[in-house]
Amino acid sequence: MIQATARILKNVIEVRVGDAVWVGRPIEAEQGGLANRLAALFSSEYHLYRPESPTVPDSTISYRAKIDEIRIQTAEDSWKTRSSVFGPMTIDYGGTTFTIHERLTGRFAILEGTTPVAVGQLGYRSCVLKDYRPELETFLAHLALGYVVRTLTWEMVG
């Protein structure tokens, strides 16, 4: 199970991947200074740190509200979601296109073609993913963080 939760008072997003805890921090918070700390409260761009190297960012996850796009940038790869007005969100990973079908209840399913590869639930500043294939765990952990950043952004905008 993957669980991403925003810790607002700490200004971080914790991502639990099995027993490990990954940490997402706003990029502005890393630069110091009061102005940057204030800007970090409204950030839509986060660095993700894994327990193996807690001081070196593993990836950058950002959200663009204007086009409803979650962007994931690792050292090797880059992925971004594509949204449509009435259709599902899509994302390409490993040469495969996945579709994300969301419900108004916060539940969603990630499909490869017509086969479900993961199911999720959005909560208040949180995202939980279950029933996924092990080889997708790292990718889905990044996506879970992106969903929490998306939720936080819409809280600020809406």
Regions found by a protein language model. Name each.
Residues 1-158:
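Intrinsically disordered, low-complexity proline/glycine-rich segments
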